[in-house]
């Protein structure tokens, strides 16, 4: 189990759950961090917890059963807001990025390193992950054809140059090369969205031809 606190970026998500929407991002992060502090106290407590915060209050609260993972499940944070990185440096065991180019990733990892340094912690203690989209096929022509089918392109259209550079689009060798570049930059885990799902050819090809190269 991984615990992933989040500030919530979508107003519609708050509304759908009957929660008030606060457009102030910094305040949403502060609320997230305070909620995490309360959760950690409850997970660690042998006695009832009383908590008086700005956003949350609890009186003689008890959380049972306690977590199986001790002292608690690993805590992961996402995105690159300075306040979120500060919280990750203080509480996190992992940090997760959206799909970004290598230069942008370097900036984000540098900011995380600075946040860790500010609290006397090594950024090497924090695992790093990135989510990205993937389309892998045996040859470049098949990659192009499947991309056209997925996004409704004409047969004469090619994969656009403006494609997100973090997307893993290509043959097994090309996808391996892109993954290695991000691994060398510091990413240790990948959350992969196979854009040709529910077809299984790409998933199976990745499992058979690409994943074993990283074992």
Where are the regions that the model predicts?
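Active-site-adjacent structural elements that line small-molecule/cofactor binding pockets in enzymes
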Residues: 1-215
């Amino acid at each position: 189990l991984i615990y992933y606190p989040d500030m919530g970026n979508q107003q519609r998500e708050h509304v759908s759950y009957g929660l008030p929407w606060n457009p102030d991002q910094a305040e949403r992060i502060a609320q997230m961090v305070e909620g995490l502090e309360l959760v950690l106290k409850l997970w660690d407590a042998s006695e009832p917890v009383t908590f008086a915060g700005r956003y949350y209050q609890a009186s003689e609260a008890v959380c049972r059963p306690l977590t199986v993972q001790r002292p608690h499940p690993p805590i992961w944070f996402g995105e690159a807001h300075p306040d979120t990185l500060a919280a990750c440096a203080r509480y996190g065991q992992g940090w997760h990025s959206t799909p970004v180019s290598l230069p942008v990733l370097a900036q984000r990892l540098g900011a995380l390193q600075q946040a860790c340094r500010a609290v006397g912690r090594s950024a090497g203690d924090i695992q790093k992950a990135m989510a990205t989209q993937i389309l892998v096929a045996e040859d470049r022509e098949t990659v192009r054809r499947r991309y056209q089918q997925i996004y409704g392109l004409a047969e004469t259209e090619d994969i656009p140059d403006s494609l997100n550079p973090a997307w893993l689009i290509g043959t097994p060798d090309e996808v391996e090369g892109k993954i290695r570049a991000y691994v060398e930059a510091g990413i240790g885990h990948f959350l992969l969205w196979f854009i040709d799902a529910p077809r299984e050819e790409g998933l199976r090809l990745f499992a058979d031809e690409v994943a074993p190269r990283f074992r």
